[in-house]
């Protein structure tokens, strides 16, 4: 999937509203992930995954801020996410299917927080963007 100029504009515009709330939005998306897909907790056995935990807030912030970096380098995701791709492929060995699950919970969280801005076109743009990010993150898997 190729992001159009209007897709890119929608992603960057919404990112401006997400950035100040990155940790809270990330924590909420992770909490949704763990509640909806409990099998994903296996990668976080060392985390406190309870509501409001510092672990959820810290890691959620990392996830969402990484998406912000990707949005800033939307035309060169391979380079922007190379280090994260290595980490997920060689060290963490996250099941690639989990990226789709997290993508879904991120979109639900964005829709709840930004219901006016997260219209059908913006949702479609974010869906494509998150799919491209997942493709890059899993590109080094063997």
Swiss-Prot record:
GO terms for molecular function: haptoglobin binding; heme binding; iron ion binding; organic acid binding; oxygen binding; oxygen carrier activity; peroxidase activity. One of its GO terms (cellular component) is haptoglobin-hemoglobin complex. Disulfide bonds: none annotated. Residues 2-142 form the Globin domain. Keywords: Heme, Iron, Metal-binding, Oxygen transport, Transport. It holds the Pfam family Globin. GO terms for biological process: hydrogen peroxide catabolic process. InterPro entries: Globin, Globin-like_sf, Globin/Proto, Hemoglobin_a-typ, Hemoglobin_oxygen_transport, Hemoglobin_pi. Red blood cells. Heme b binds at residue 88. Signal peptide: none annotated. O2 binds at residue 59. Heterotetramer of two alpha chains and two beta chains. Belongs to the globin family. This is a larval (tadpole) alpha-globin. This is Hemoglobin subunit alpha-4. It comes from Xenopus laevis.
């Amino acid at each position: 999937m190729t992001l159009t100029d209007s897709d890119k504009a929608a992603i960057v515009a919404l990112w401006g509203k997400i950035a100040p709330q990155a940790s809270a939005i990330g924590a909420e998306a992770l909490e949704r992930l763990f509640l909806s897909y409990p099998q994903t907790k296996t990668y976080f056995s060392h985390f406190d995954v309870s509501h409001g935990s510092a672990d959820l807030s810290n890691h959620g912030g990392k996830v969402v801020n990484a998406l912000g970096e990707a949005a800033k380098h939307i035309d060169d995701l391979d380079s922007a996410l190379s280090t994260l791709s290595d980490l997920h492929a060689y060290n963490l060995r996250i099941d690639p299917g989990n990226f789709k699950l997290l993508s879904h919970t991120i979109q639900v969280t964005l829709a709840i927080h930004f219901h006016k801005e997260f219209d059908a076109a913006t949702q479609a743009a974010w869906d494509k963007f998150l799919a491209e990010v997942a493709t890059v993150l899993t590109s080094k898997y063997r």
